[in-house]
């Protein structure tokens, strides 16, 4: 798909991190950008920054786990600009779950699924029919993760399960768009190949009351800085991928019509091969990993 001025891109989770980097990159291509996020103050700041740089911007406070909120976002985008050409279902959270799976609070799962899975589905339902009906080339990018999207991560099982669901959902979306003969493409994004400095580690700041934890955490929430310090203390250097690099990967992938937005990585390739071989061999999953601090 060719990206050009006059087109409109919608990005959820756009107030910071990967989402804001994608919005900046689309704006640099001359696209109008619609920013959606649950954090109102950060959203206003992001929109003001882009507008000051000359971008055409619409910002809306949105809870992607609420279908009506996402439908209202679509209505606002189409009312303001008449069409949407790129949709990035990017909003995501960590669950805050502790301990073994059978010890998790149901609300940890409900909240993570509300944002990471239902949020993507709500975006698809709200925008894709209109994008198809418009007849112009378009593209949908759904953000997954190597943690779950490539192979399970048992020590972050809730998050990993949601990101695995995003991969399968996007594969199904791709097939449905092809069967429809639509001019709209689909991709699944695996940000990386290294760690990213985003607000994911502090997701609990946005946890809604309806999904509140039923009991206090046994340990405090850990920050990315604390994780990095613990890794260094254990003798492991943590590598980071700039969010701008992820945004560039997205733009390149849209232009190429690439389904798997998966950056080159020997580690990812090993995980893909190991998991596939385990299935072919009907063998136990010896490839499962754990992270320090989990």
Identify the residue ranges that each predicted region occupies:
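Conserved glycine-rich Rossmann-like NAD(P)H-binding loop of the short-chain dehydrogenase/reductase
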Residues: 29-46
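Active-site loop of short-chain dehydrogenase/reductase
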Residues: 6-7, 56, 83-84, 131-145, ...
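Canonical Rossmann dinucleotide-binding motif of NAD(H)/NADP(H)-dependent dehydrogenases/reductases
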Residues: 2-34
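The beta1-alpha1 cofactor-binding region of Rossmann-like NAD(H)/NADP(H)-dependent oxidoreductases
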Residues: 40-41, 61-72, 106, 143
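Substrate-binding pocket helix/loop in short-chain dehydrogenase/reductase
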Residues: 98-101, 105-110
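Catalytic loop of short-chain dehydrogenase/reductase
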Residues: 141-165, 171, 175-179, 192-195, ...
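SDR active-site lid
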Residues: 179-261
């Amino acid at each position: 798909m060719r990206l050009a001025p006059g087109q409109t891109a919608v990005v959820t989770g756009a107030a910071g991190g990967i989402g804001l980097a994608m919005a900046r990159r689309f704006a640099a291509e001359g696209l109008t950008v619609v920013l959606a996020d649950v954090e109102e103050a950060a959203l206003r700041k992001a929109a003001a920054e882009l507008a000051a740089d000359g971008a055409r911007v619409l910002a809306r406070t949105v809870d992607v786990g609420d279908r009506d909120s996402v439908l209202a976002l679509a209505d606002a985008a189409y009312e303001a600009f008449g069409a949407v050409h790129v949709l990035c279902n990017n909003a995501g959270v960590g669950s805050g779950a502790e301990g073994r799976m059978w010890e998790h609070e149901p609300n940890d799962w409900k909240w993570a699924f509300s944002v990471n899975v239902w949020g993507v589905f709500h975006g698809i339902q709200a925008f894709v029919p209109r994008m198809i009906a418009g007849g112009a080339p378009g593209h949908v990018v759904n953000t997954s993760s190597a943690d779950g999207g490539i192979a399970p991560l048992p020590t972050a099982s809730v998050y990993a399960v949601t990101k695995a669901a995003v991969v399968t959902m996007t594969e199904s979306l791709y097939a449905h768009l092809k069967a429809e003969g639509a001019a709209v493409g689909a991709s699944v994004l695996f940000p990386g190949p290294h760690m990213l400095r985003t607000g994911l580690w502090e997701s609990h700041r946005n946890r809604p009351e309806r999904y509140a934890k039923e009991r206090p955490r046994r340990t405090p929430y850990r920050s990315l800085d604390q994780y990095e310090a613990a890794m260094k203390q254990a003798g492991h250097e943590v590598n980071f991928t700039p969010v701008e690099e992820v945004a560039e990967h997205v733009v390149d992938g849209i232009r190429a019509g690439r389904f798997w937005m998966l950056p080159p990585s020997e580690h990812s390739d090993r995980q893909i091969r190991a998991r596939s071989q385990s299935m072919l061999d009907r063998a136990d999953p010896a490839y499962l990993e754990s992270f320090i601090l989990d």
